Regions:
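Conserved glycine-rich Rossmann-like NAD(P)H-binding loop of the short-chain dehydrogenase/reductase
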Residues: 28-43
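Conserved N-terminal Rossmann-fold NAD(P) cofactor-binding segment
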Residues: 40-72
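C-terminal catalytic/substrate-binding lobe primarily of soluble NAD(P)-dependent oxidoreductases
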Residues: 133, 156-394
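Rossmann-fold NAD(P)-binding glycine/threonine-rich loop
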Residues: 112-134
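Conserved Rossmann-fold cofactor-binding substructure of NAD(P)-dependent oxidoreductases
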Residues: 63-82, 86-92
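N-terminal Rossmann NAD(P)H-binding glycine-rich loop of SDR-like oxidoreductase domains
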Residues: 4-24
């Protein structure tokens, strides 16, 4: 008998606080016990007080756990049915938590965007997680819920037995450049700098190749990584080597709905030639600067871990994913929209995923699996009903 239904590890970090508040707000309707966990008892008590004051009758429990003290992580995992971790970077702090969940048969969720971490966890723990009947589900935030479920929604509107191709074009809107930069938390900024090196980008490409080698009997391919121009919207597409691609490909490998063959492309959508050229220049400068150790050290200083955008800035941020799906006999265009991608929407996606695993009759699939493979239509419904996401066929 587990003591808690859902435990949130890293609850006093920036995204952790937002997720804790969202979960506390949902307890009255969903009826689950909640614990918040971390290493700083004082901060946990402060958050507990604020949440219980705001949501009357919402009892919040506290667990002390530290990634540097593995017995405390094991104890935390053994005490709960579903464990959410917002403690990153996950390459540094994630494996201890995953391992504890695998051993104890505890379902695990995170919001990592670190492709190499996801790959390592699948290679190391998929078999043992399947044996212990643990669902290890990475990328349950903006990376990669919109891409994974947007693609899933798109292919559901195409004939099942035909070859399928999906292109995803993403855009994020903010009030202005200052607001856009302020919208990045310290943790996200540090993770991005860790990713932005040429070796990591090359490793990401190698990872896609490994996934493609697993694609029999279903053939899975990545669409050519070249710039796109969309005449209808006068917008340019820049190929993005991000974890979303890996997640979508893994979903396609495991589910029959994706058809006998499936191809996917993932692009950043930029409106107009001036912004397109400016974005290319900005990205090139950022990538170049991040290769020079002294400059990279200075870039790290621009954001502190724990920093993040205020509610006013978050309320101005929106995301939009446009999916173009094609099969032999049909073409469909899908729009997926939501609020502040980095934090507001992410906390809702993560929270709803945890509640979905706990309360919904989801498929009995275990191991290191994707959000779509784990939760499918059940989470798709929750995202639209509770997380302010809209999925539309245009």
């Amino acid at each position: 008998m587990r003591e808690y239904d859902i435990t949130l590890f890293g609850a006093t970090g920036f995204t952790g606080i937002l997720t804790a508040e969202y979960l506390a707000s949902r307890r009255a309707k969903e009826d689950f016990s909640l614990a918040i966990a971390g290493r700083n008892k004082g901060r946990l008590l402060g958050l507990k007080y604020e949440l219980e004051k705001k949501y009357i009758g919402s009892e919040i429990n506290i667990l002390l756990a530290d990634v540097d003290e593995e017995p405390s992580i094991r104890k935390m995992a053994e005490a709960t049915k579903v464990l959410i971790s917002t403690v990153g970077p996950y390459l540094l702090y994630g494996e201890t938590v995953v391992r504890a969940c695998v051993v104890s048969g505890t379902h695990y969720l995170d919001l990592t965007g670190e492709g190499s971490f996801v790959e390592q966890m699948e290679l190391k723990y998929h078999k043992s997680a399947n044996e212990s009947e643990a669902k290890i589900i990475n990328c349950c935030g903006y990376d990669s819920i919109p891409a994974d479920f947007g693609t899933y929604f798109t292919i559901k509107n195409l004939p099942t037995t035909e070859l399928k191709e999906v292109e995803c074009f993403i855009s994020v809107t903010s009030k202005d450049f200052t607001s856009a930069f302020s919208s990045i938390s310290g943790g996200t900024w540090h993770s991005a700098l860790g990713f932005m090196n040429l070796q990591e980008i090359e490793r990401q490409r190698d990872m896609y190749a490994k996934i493609l080698l697993r694609s029999r009997p279903r053939e899975i391919t990545v669409l050519p990584t070249e710039f796109r121009f969309r005449e209808a919207s006068k917008s340019f597409g820049i190929p993005l080597p991000v974890v979303d691609i890996e997640v979508v490909l893994r979903s396609a490998l495991q589910l029959e709905e994706y058809g006998p063959a499936f191809s996917y492309g993932h692009f950043l959508s930029i409106q107009g030639l001036p912004k397109f050229l400016g974005s290319l220049l900005g990205f090139s400068l950022f990538l170049g600067a991040s290769q020079i150790p002294p400059i990279k050290d200075l870039l790290y200083l621009l954001k502190k871990n724990g920093d993040g955008p205020n509610e006013e800035i978050r309320s101005t941020n929106k995301f939009h994913h446009s999916f173009i799906g094609k099969s032999g006999s049909k073409t469909v265009q899908v729009s997926v929209t939501g609020g502040d991608p980095g934090y507001g929407a992410t906390s809702k996606m993560l929270g709803e995923a945890a509640i979905c695993i706990l309360n919904d009759p989801i498929p009995e699939r275990y191991g290191v699996i994707t959000p779509v493979v784990a939760m499918g239509d059940f989470l798709l419904e929750r995202l639209q009903k509770n997380a302010d996401m809209k999925f539309k066929v245009l």
